[in-house]
Amino acid sequence: MPIITIYQGASGEGQELAETVAQGLGYHCVGREVLVEASRRYRIPEAKLNEIVEKGPHWWERLLQDLRPYRVALQAALCELADDGKVVYHGHLGHELLPGIGHVLKVLLTAPIEFRIEQVRSRQNLADAAARHYIEEVDKARSRRLMAMFGTDWRDPNRFDLILNMSRMRREGATRVIIEAAKLEEYQPTAASEQVFNDLALGSRVHATLLASPDVQGSALEVRAEGGHVYVKGRIDQGSEDEVLNLVKNVPGVIKVTSDLYSVPPDAFFGP
């Protein structure tokens, strides 16, 4: 059975639906747990991760802030939580955190704006105008964040496998549709798709470990894994190559390391 991600905008019952689907499949349901796991493992304050996930960046943040450490830490944490494949993730990053994996069913919950306004109004006791403003602001913030982190737009239907109009069905009906879709042959794990997942999990775990190290944080590194063989390349601070390689070798699952690292002396930018 596939890993399932469920995305919904600022309204509705995405979490409740995810929990119902997970119960029906015997899966575990995760959402905020990804933030907690990433914070615990990779030394990123949970409040900062929550800010990164929930709030859209201003234009100057997009220029000045490197979002890689947060993206990679969240990816590594989700891979860790989804290691057994029996996961339903609810949130607005999951469908982008597991790219290229055939046994992931990506679900988008949508509805007309009037339906969403009614849901937010009743859930948060807001007037219609306030509910509309809330939805618009949250949607814009999440759109900016996804574009900044992944270069993608959540409104692109091609990013998802299944799109459900929640104004047309109850939670029970949506649950049945998702569970039946999860049984389709196209979304079942294969040896190839499981290898892609394992490579992504190991590569992101190594990358997150490097970015969490104070001695490596300023480096510009690319990391990928293939069957336990980890490839690391990029610019590092002068004299830090041994530290980088030791960090990589100590990550569980790493069998072999190939590096292509270079450093630039501090005075190289100032001339004679």
What are these language model-derived features?
Residues 5-19:
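Glycine-rich phosphate-binding P-loop
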Residues 35-89, 126:
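ATP-dependent small-molecule kinase phosphotransfer cores
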Residues 123, 128-142, 193-201:
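Surface-exposed, low-hydrophobicity interaction/linker segments
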Residues 100, 111, 118-119, 148, ...:
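N-terminal targeting leaders
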Residues 102-122, 135:
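Conserved phosphate-donor/acceptor-positioning beta-strand/loop module used by diverse small-molecule
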Residues 91-95:
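Short, polar loop motifs at secondary-structure junctions
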Residues 28-36:
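A short beta-strand-loop structural module common to alpha/beta enzyme folds
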